[in-house]
């Protein structure tokens, strides 16, 4: 049986992404795509995301995050592929 490789991505979402349920949306989508990691509001009004999982799932997750929730608007999504840490057992909202 082939082993599924874990990949990781670090993202910064800009736009109308705070006060619109964006972190909860990201957490729910992470669960949908079996992604592990975290999401965090940043003081500058952006949202930071670290996500780990299979590359195909991450690609789909990134596309959904870029689309954003109904009342939010992502004007720019910075995406950097990074080394996975494999430290996560789920996906959390950080404060």
What are these regions (language model features)?
Residues 1-95:
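Intrinsically disordered, low-complexity, mixed-charge
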